[in-house]
Regions:
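An N-terminal hydrophobic leader/cap segment in hydrolases
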Residues: 18-64, 71
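Proline-centered loop/turn at the N-terminus of a beta-strand
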Residues: 110, 152, 175-176, 213-215
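N-terminal Lys/Arg-rich, disordered targeting/topogenic segments
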Residues: 1-17
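Short glycine-enriched, charge-decorated loop/helix-capping segments at active-site entrances
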Residues: 125-128, 192-197
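Primarily recognizes the serine-hydrolase "nucleophile elbow" in alpha/beta-hydrolase
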Residues: 138-146, 150-195, 206
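The feature captures the conserved acid-bearing segment of alpha/beta-hydrolase catalytic domains
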Residues: 195-215
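Membrane-embedded segments
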Residues: 65-141, 145, 151, 163
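Short gly/ser/thr-rich secondary-structure transition/capping motifs
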Residues: 63-70, 195-200
Length: 215
């Protein structure tokens, strides 16, 4: 009697088990996951820190491809042969990495770093596509305004910065590429195999197109 009561309660709460019902549930969960990943994933990928940073005389304003201004910093080094084009991590901004940039300069390189749209004092909102625009703007400023030869630019990407760094290096003949703590793709940070019909920062597909030395 007690077993029958338990079965009746389960049937009321969960319904009769069937493979059709199970498949419908799996399809619903998968569709919800796709919807959430497509519309809300960039809010998880990009986490701009709260910053009290103000534009100082060190800060350069450059135009991204969509017309918005992003902030950049250039630490020249007259003795340096190479310039590091630095793309920072998802929870960093220029104000928080100044010490890193100075250490790189003091180790024998010139350094050019920038904030993605929505970071620091850069205008706009961060997105995968906007990071590609932003690194292009930084690269163009280096080569066109500062006259740095492409072969003397080493592109450095840390964490999410590996995405724009790899993307640029796959399209331009730069002097080298350094990738630190990055990922094969954004969604495969959580899953070892691709389970969604789309992805972001698919670095694994681009790294093979890089013809420069990679570290």
């Amino acid at each position: 009697m007690a077993n029958n009561n338990r079965k009746n309660i389960k049937r009321l709460l969960f319904g009769e088990f069937s493979w059709k019902r199970l498949m419908r549930s799996i399809i619903f969960i998968y569709a919800f996951l796709c919807f959430y990943a497509f519309f809300f994933s960039e809010g998880l990928i990009f986490q701009p820190p709260s910053s009290s940073q103000n534009d100082s005389r060190e800060v350069i304003k450059i135009n991204s491809a969509n017309g918005l201004k992003i902030s950049a910093i250039h630490f020249p080094n007259p003795q340096a042969k190479y310039t590091i084009l630095y793309s920072h991590g998802n929870a960093e901004d220029l104000d928080g990495i100044l010490w890193v940039l100075r250490e790189i300069r003091d180790s024998g390189f010139a350094v050019f770093a920038y904030d993605y749209q929505g970071y620091g004092t850069s205008q706009g909102r961060p997105s995968e596509y906007n990071t590609y625009r932003d690194i292009d703007a930084a690269y163009n400023y280096l080569t066109q305004q500062l006259g740095v030869p492409a072969k003397q630019i080493i592109v450095y990407g840390r964490s999410v910065g590996g995405g724009p760094a790899i993307d640029l290096a796959s399209r331009q003949s730069v002097g080298g590429l350094v990738v630190e703590s990055s990922f094969v793709s954004a969604f495969r940070v959580l899953t070892q195999i691709p389970i969604l019909p789309f992805d972001k920062f698919v670095n694994i597909d681009k790294i093979g197109k890089v013809r420069s030395p990679v570290l």
